[in-house]
Curated annotation (Swiss-Prot):
Belongs to the Nogo receptor family. Predominantly expressed in brain. Expressed at lower levels in kidney, lung, mammary gland, placenta, salivary gland, skeletal muscle and spleen. It comes from Homo sapiens (Human). The gene is RTN4RL1. Gene3D superfamilies: Ribonuclease Inhibitor. This is Reticulon-4 receptor-like 1. GO terms for biological process: axon regeneration; corpus callosum development; negative regulation of axon regeneration; negative regulation of neuron projection development.
């Protein structure tokens, strides 16, 4: 009899251990106990639901109508937070203060989230994936990524970012993927990518790039993939690409390339490049329109002396200075840009540094005839797969489909507690235990 009583007590302890702390899930949500996971996706919530257990490590709130994030909404024990595809317009600067365990934060597809405070992500020392795609951002404040030394994946695509300040990514020493495509960037300065010594993939396609400083890619020694297609580049010196010793995949098509003497250094670099590259269709001069720069011969540049003829050097310098001086752009973070330099704010007045491209009027050259995309290098799409699985919880960076894809609904697996039946689940377990106890007695 004593042995039977011990068995009953053991069963009761096991049942109690399986019931989540705090008495259940928020209403209309699904919970999973180990690790504590709360899924409240696609329930039309206008605010963070109440009753999220304090020991929750993973919280999924995507596809709702949540508008604000405030301190106290989440527990510092959280490791993963998905809150993409909501209506977030404001994130209080202290919302994630003390979240030293947070590893993945998905704020993407919140199209009214147009500004971020510099300290929004301060202290997230374990964060390795940050999603800020499709957020309506037009600028990034200085220091917004400060201290994120563990970050490996940063998704900033499909915003309205027009320029990047020097050293904006300088603390991201472990970053491997930087997605900036689908923005409105028109220039890259000497310190834009400074500090990204471990960057593997840089996507800059579908911007409005027309000016690249000759040291823009200086620190990217480990870069293997660079996409610059569908921009407004007419010129890119080989010196810009020289530091990219690990480069394997390069796309330059869809730009209005000038294949005159200015293109000689790029042509020479392409002859030495052993990776895979797209075609580089010429738009000018007229005799070379439609030709591939890669397929030109040394004889095509026999009349070029040095990197460019003296006339071209003079014309290039004047064009850069004059057009940069005429371009008016007001930074949201400070005074207007220095008229002597076409990239972002600069202290004082100085002559423009050596650059790799010639800035042009954005509307001057149409890209319609710039050439077809190379068939061997299709447009890049992130290899996302739906990253939520109750059966095998992800231990490494999850892969996901594009954010515009229809979301796969999450089904409650065996053993999962749902808010609508929390009490009935506990009652059923207790009834079963008591019945077994009666049988044993």
């Amino acid at each position: 009899m004593l042995r039977k009583g011990c068995c009953v007590e053991l069963l009761l302890l096991l049942v109690a251990a399986e019931l989540p702390l705090g008495g259940g899930c928020p209403r209309d949500c699904v919970c999973y106990p180990a690790p504590m996971t709360v899924s409240c996706q696609a329930h039309n919530f206008a605010a963070i639901p109440e009753g999220i257990p304090v020991d929750s490590e993973r919280v999924f709130l995507q596809n709702n109508r949540i508008g604000l994030l405030q301190p106290g909404h989440f527990s510092p024990a959280m490791v993963t937070l998905w809150i993409y595809s909501n209506n977030i317009t404001y994130i209080h600067p202290s919302t994630f203060e003390g979240f030293v365990h947070l590893e993945e934060l998905d704020l993407g597809d919140n199209r009214q989230l147009r500004t971020l405070a510099p300290e929004t992500f301060q202290g997230l020392v374990k964060l390795h994936a940050l999603y800020l795609y499709k957020c309506g951002l037009s600028a990034l404040p200085a220091g917004v990524f400060g201290g994120l030394h563990s970050l490996q994946y940063l998704y900033l695509q499909d915003n309205h970012i027009e320029y990047l300040q020097d050293d904006i990514f300088v603390d991201l020493v472990n970053l491997s993927h930087l997605f900036l495509h689908g923005n409105k960037l028109w220039s890259l300065g000497p310190g834009t990518f400074r500090g990204l010594v471990n960057l593997d993939r840089l996507l800059l396609h579908e911007n409005q790039l027309q000016w690249v400083h000759h040291k823009a890619f200086h620190d990217l020694r480990r870069l293997t993939t660079l996409f610059l297609f569908n921009n407004s580049l007419s010129e890119l010196q080989g010196e810009c690409l020289a530091p990219l010793g690990a480069l394997e995949f390069l796309r330059l098509n869809g730009n209005p390339w000038d294949c005159g003497c200015r293109a000689r250094s790029l042509w020479e670099w392409l002859q030495r490049f052993r990776g895979s590259s797209s075609a580089v269709p010429c738009v000018s001069p007229g005799l070379r329109h439609g030709q591939d720069l890669k397929l030109l011969r040394a004889e095509d540049f026999r009349n070029c002396t040095g990197p460019a003829s003296p006339h071209q050097i003079k014309s290039h310098t004047l064009t850069t200075t004059d057009r940069a001086a005429r371009k008016e752009h007001h930074s949201p973070h400070g005074p207007t840009r220095s008229k002597g330099h076409p990239h972002g704010p600069r202290p004082g007045h100085r002559k423009p540094g050596k650059n790799c491209t010639n800035p042009r009027n954005r509307n001057q050259i149409s890209k319609a005839g710039a050439g077809k995309q190379a068939p061997e290098l299709p447009d890049y799409a992130p290899d996302y797969q739906h990253k939520f699985s109750f059966d095998i919880m992800p231990t490494a960076r999850p892969k996901r489909k594009g954010k515009c894809a229809r979301r796969t609904p999450i089904r409650a697996p065996s053993g999962v507690q749902q808010a609508s039946s929390a009490s009935s689940l506990g009652a059923s377990l207790l009834a079963w235990t008591l019945g077994l106890a009666v049988t044993l007695r």
